A protein has these predicted regions:
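Flavin (primarily FAD) cofactor-binding/catalytic cores of flavoenzymes
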Residues: 2-50, 54-56, 98-218, 222-480
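A conserved beta-strand/loop capping segment in the N-terminal third of enzymes
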Residues: 75-108
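Conserved N-terminal ligand/cofactor-binding loop architecture of enzyme catalytic domains
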Residues: 55, 59-88
Length: 480
């Protein structure tokens, strides 16, 4: 199936979708893939971009996904699905090479290729479709979606309206730029980029005399390593600065990984809001640390460059905050730094900066601004999210709105983790069908979190009295 689709006539409220998805990243792609196996469930998913591409600026050669290949779009909910990573390999006659490679973790570029394969063959995905507005239609008791179909240049080609009984928002994250560096990032021609755009600027960075990488997570480590490997010994000209007190490894012990299970997600969701807000920043090594292999590769490369005497022209400094930033008269960049433990301050001159400063959840309430009066919020004005990943709404709105990767404050560190994608998709779909279509295990971890263990309402992972059951007669998408 091609991702380029001709416009179809807008349907009326007499033919609503059971579920309309806004955004097609890995999480909504997972949901679409699992929904494809459910008879009589009418779904369609919409994405403004012309095609699927997963973090294209960070598909560095050799960079690996930090979860096993079993954490694909569907396997942990339905390993017999045609959309598994193993079936992707089979379709490309690569099963035996993969088997002999004995790889549990695949490269990012391969994960991206797998997802693009699914996006090209899975029906009901509408790329080049911009959702303009979402409203609740009180007369029809349906969500009303206005959309614009875009041509290859991004210009409007067709406008339409559709209706759905339920929505799922998968609008993803956006690069985070620390406030002191925003003026430089927003100035054209200034060599300050976010790591999300690294590959686009890689050749220019390799030709630059001195580069500073800011940020200590996996992306920062991969960018630093790639620059280090491709710059001449003795003339590396690299600084790596991080606010964390150390270049710390990611927590990857077997029991530590149980923080990325449905058991922990349920436990976390049941905690008081104030406790949840304290926990997430304390758990930074669960999701902001560096893979052991990457740290080893960096140290090995640095050590290799000492074999002929001397030290590489690199500086790695943790515990540093960028207070302010600007440009010098010589058109270089000047960062004003402060060391957290010493209390000392210094001026750092460089020619280019790569910000590996992470991502922030996009505000989900902007895309559904017309529904803002109906959204129930917590003490910090964030949308409240229930156990089944639904925004808590005023009862006047009868249809549910689900969210993907926008609920770390409600479901913990596992919210953006690819390993929970299939499980969360199954939970959402089970709540949409009369009977659970993907039975889920009531227990998923050896760790018992809390003195009063939390258990799902049933083995299917939903509470029957909260289920939103929809029926329809066919699976044809009606939007787009």
């Amino acid at each position: 199936m091609s991702t380029a689709q001709p416009p179809t006539p807008a349907a009326g409220p007499e033919q609503p979708l059971d579920l309309a998805g806004i955004g097609i990243g890995p999480f909504n792609l997972s949901l679409a893939a699992l929904a494809h196996g459910i008879p009589c469930l009418r779904t369609a998913f919409y994405e403004q971009r012309p095609a699927f591409h997963w973090h294209p600026g960070l598909l560095i050669d050799g960079a690996k996904v930090q979860v096993p290949f079993l954490a694909d779009l569907v396997t942990l909910a339905n390993p017999t699905s045609p959309w598994t990573f193993l079936n992707y390999l089979k379709a490309h006659e690569r099963l035996f090479p993969f088997y002999n490679a004995e790889r549990f973790h695949i490269e990012r570029a391969e994960y991206d290729a797998y997802c693009r394969w699914v996006s090209h063959h899975l029906p009901g995905l509408h790329f080049g479709h911009q959702i303009d507005a979402v409203r609740w239609n009180h007369d029809h008791l349906l969500f009303e979606l206005d959309y614009t179909e875009l041509d290859a240049t991004g210009e409007a080609r067709h406008m339409g309206r559709g209706y759905a009984r339920a929505l799922v928002l998968g609008v993803g994250t956006e690069p985070h730029v620390p406030a002191p560096l925003c003026p430089l990032v927003d100035t054209p021609g200034v060599p300050v980029i976010h790591s999300a755009d690294y590959l686009e600027h890689r050749e220019a960075l390799l030709a630059t005399g001195h580069v500073t990488v800011v940020g200590s997570g996996q992306s920062g480590a991969e960018v630093f390593l790639d620059l280090l490997r491709n710059r001449p010994p003795g003339a590396e000209g690299l600084h790596w600065l991080t606010r964390t007190p150390a270049f710390a490894p990611m927590e990857y012990s077997k029991l530590g990984l149980e923080h990325f299970t449905p058991d922990y997600a349920r436990y976390f969701h049941a905690l008081p809001e104030c406790v949840r807000d304290q926990l997430v920043p304390r758990q930074w090594q669960l999701y902001k640390g560096i893979a052991h292999d990457t740290m080893t590769d960096i140290h090995d490369e640095l050590y290799r460059r000492t074999r002929h005497g001397g030290w590489p022209d690199t500086v790695l400094t943790p515990g540093v905050t960028v207070r302010t930033a600007g440009r010098t008269a010589a058109a270089r960049l000047e960062l004003h730094l402060e060391h957290a433990q010493q209390g000392a301050r210094s001026r750092h001159i460089t020619e280019a900066v790569v910000l590996a400063t992470g991502y922030r959840e996009r505000r989900i309430d902007t895309i559904i601004a017309a529904l803002d009066p109906y959204i129930r919020r917590d003490s910090r004005e964030r949308p409240r999210i229930d156990e089944h990943h639904r925004i808590v709404l005023d009862p006047i709105v009868k249809g549910p709105i689900y969210v993907q990767n926008a609920q770390r404050h409600a479901h913990g560190v596992g919210a953006p983790d690819l390993g929970l994608a299939a499980w969360r998709s199954a939970v959402i779909l089970n709540s949409l069908t009369t009977e659970p279509v993907y039975p889920l295990p009531p227990r998923t971890a050896f760790t018992t979190f809390g003195l009063q263990p939390t258990h799902p309402g049933s083995a299917a992972g939903h509470l029957p009295e909260q289920r939103d059951s929809f029926r329809s007669s066919d699976t044809q998408a009606i939007l787009g």
